[in-house]
Amino acid sequence: MVKDKAPDLSKHTPMMRQYLALKANHPNTLLFYRMGDFYELFHEDAEKAARLLDITLTTRGQSAGVPIKMCGIPFHSLEPYLARLVKLGESAVICEQIGDPATSKGPVERAVARIVTPGTLTDAALIDDKQDLWLLAVTTHRNTAGIARLNLASGEFILIEVPTEQIPATLERIRPAEILYPESWTPNFGVDVARTRQPDWYFEFDSARRLLCDQFEVASLAGFGAEGLKPAIAAAGALLQYAQATQSGKLPHLRGLTVEIEGAYLGLDLATRRNLELTETLRGQPSPTLFSLLDNCVTSMGSRLLRHTLHHPLRARDIPAARHGAVEALLEDYGRLGNEVRKALRGIADIERIAGRVALRNARPRDLASLRESVARLEGLRAPLSDSPAPLIAQLFTELETPYPALELLVRAIAAEPGAQVRDGGVIAPGYDPDLDELRSLNDNCGAFLVDMEARERERSGIASLKVEYNKVHGFYIEVTHANVDKIPDDYRRRQTLKNAERYITPELKAFEDKALSAQERSLAREKLLYEAILDALLPVVPTLQTIARAIAQLDLLAGFAESALKRNWCKPEFAAETQLSITGGRHPVVEGELTNQAETFIANDCLLAENRRLLLITGPNMGGKSTYMRQVALIALLAHIGCYVPADRCVLGPLDRIFTRIGASDDLASGRSTFMVEMTEAAAILHHATNQSLVLMDEIGRGTSTFDGMALAFAILRHLIEKNQSLTLFATHYFELTRLSHEYSELANVHLGAVEHNDRIVFMHAVEEGPANQSYGIQVAALAGIPTAVVRAARKQLREFEQRAAVDPLQPDLFAQGAPEPAEPEPHPVVEQLAAIDPDSLTPREALDALYALKGLLR
């Protein structure tokens, strides 16, 4: 956290001096200052919080001659307000009273108890249980970006280095909750998340490396494979320093770094993730998406792994193939294995996040009770897995071994139904600690003592209505109505006067009060001490709990895949060494799911792409299903690469490195880009980066400009994809002239989506057939959309005129006719090419001089 210069406190009241001293350490963060039963905010913080949280802003008194603006919330309502702030991208500092008001001279001592930021949340009430929460830091060195990300709840700490132009795509894949970056930057991240500037020295490599080595208790980072990753280590150091500051100390559950290799995942750029609607629809809704369809997971850990897996399909096939084998094993004996696993998973709590809170020492009593019940279920979860032939399931069986010492501790120490907070008591189980049991016994005997004393005092005083009672404000007292005050014994001392009664205390009752209240206070203090000792005892078990949590998530994911495959009749995909994407009876998983809900049937289609058939040119009417067909092919490929069965009768896939999509039309007003500019930008990315192992989907290229321009661009892009990229491509178009290219390129095949016209009406068949379409049915689709009949009639008349005129004198030349050859574009001079590749801002003086000599050498 960045600190401001300390303010002049001499003219302020003692309480405001204390507040301002704390606030000076957190100038850019809302500070919640505990005062009795409320958290108060002052001055600018109060104005901001009142606006964001819709609470009353008031002014009370003055300090240093300035009116004190303030607002507040009850202490027991803090969490909902924090949740609202975090959703708005705000951070908060929680300042608690740590001194005793009864013994304090001046303001009660206060200290920062925790700092809540969008990327460092661990409280279950503040975070989505089905989504990982990543804190991310990024910095650059020359043309390389170092990115570090931390999941504080699970302890995952991951590094990656990518070219700087890939920062937006990487952030879109990770979807962090908060991004840290050097304050000297003007970032353009391309994602809308909370951003936190940090001093540039936070990202200094040497200090970052030392900090990381201290955290992991190692001499170097070579053991993690990270020693040479300077930008990533710099980012990781800034990240760790920030996390330690927010958690007020060390993070014992962070035990190492994972280096993510660029290219380990099937490449999905921003446009592809959006167009395939993996976890969010094009309209920003959570369903219907691939995630909402597949999320059969029983545990929140499984749901989070599913979301992560959808955005991280693996390029290598070993892990997906192992998952296919595990799903197959679950399906072969689903009643005994798959179904039993899902039953056993029910009731298992979020062990991953509870373990994180144990490590951070902010686990609540009910967290430990949930952990106890979940660990006790592990043997029942393991039992069905014991004889599975699938290697992955056998591995999970080993990882799910019950940590019995931890379980025994939780059973002995934590009450069956503990209180919500340690401060409320009732957390430690009876019989765990003799001293606590004795203190509780004193406290529990209060009721019997009061009943006995009430009977004795009634007999002694002759007052039948006399009561001996207790409340938290006035303690123990004897209550006598005004009509009977003349009968009270001499040793009664008045404690409080009410409208209809007087309350008294006696020496005997006072002595008991001191003893009872002391026992209660000591009992709560003892429980707090014991609870902290239990957290200490559980700390060494945290790595084991993290392993168990990962195994449960993996098993839940696999069981969910098996459930989807069984319910929807999906097949096990096959991986092949040669170039191909062969799908028989493929369906779009999400569209089929929606149609099934409406008791309708999805029309299955085949797709064959191979070495000698690399491009399918798709024609057909609007609404005929071209975009759905293209997306289903991409989704089937992606599902295979995450280890899931696929919606098809059969599927064989060769090697893939990336999936590109150019589908749909939308402008980007925020960046000032028109629909056509967005289309061309996405097409440019494909042409620059697609390889012969990429799957490319391109829909309606060139429609955002004039007919001639659009057709010329579509032709040139199509030719480039065939000749240069040589990708496996699905290319949908309304330019029927492009279909003639099948005579020029043997690897291009024409297919179309069929339709039938009857009495000026159109019926879409949604079936993919070989060969080109013969017309687009645009006017019929316009009629279906509700265009006025008169307009449709006029359009038909105009179309006939165009067709008659074209038969005599074609409106447009044949773009594919062989005309006079165009003059060849001059080849750029080598000096120009090399000069264009130089980034002067990234060169050292020595490197710039070397580059200049190299250019001069080329001129010779």
Curated annotation (Swiss-Prot):
Homology family: Belongs to the DNA mismatch repair MutS family.
Protein name according to UniProt: DNA mismatch repair protein MutS
Keyword DNA damage tagged: yes
A biological process term (GO) from this entry: mismatch repair
Chain's role: This protein is involved in the repair of mismatches in DNA. It is possible that it carries out the mismatch recognition step. This protein has a weak ATPase activity.
Domain of life: Bacteria
Organism, scientific name: Dechloromonas aromatica (strain RCB)
SUPFAM superfamilies the UniProt entry points to: DNA repair protein MutS, domain I, DNA repair protein MutS, domain II, DNA repair protein MutS, domain III, P-loop containing nucleoside triphosphate hydrolases
Lineage, uppermost ranks: Bacteria, Pseudomonadati, Pseudomonadota, Betaproteobacteria, Rhodocyclales
Membrane-crossing segments per the record: none
Pfam families: MutS_I, MutS_II, MutS_III, MutS_IV, MutS_V
Disulfide topology: none
Entry-linked PROSITE patterns: DNA_MISMATCH_REPAIR_2 (PS00486)
Keywords: ATP-binding, DNA damage, DNA repair, DNA-binding, Nucleotide-binding
Keyword DNA damage: yes
Molecular function via GO: ATP binding; ATP-dependent DNA damage sensor activity; damaged DNA binding; mismatched DNA binding
Record's GO cellular component terms: cytosol
Gene that this polypeptide is encoded by: mutS
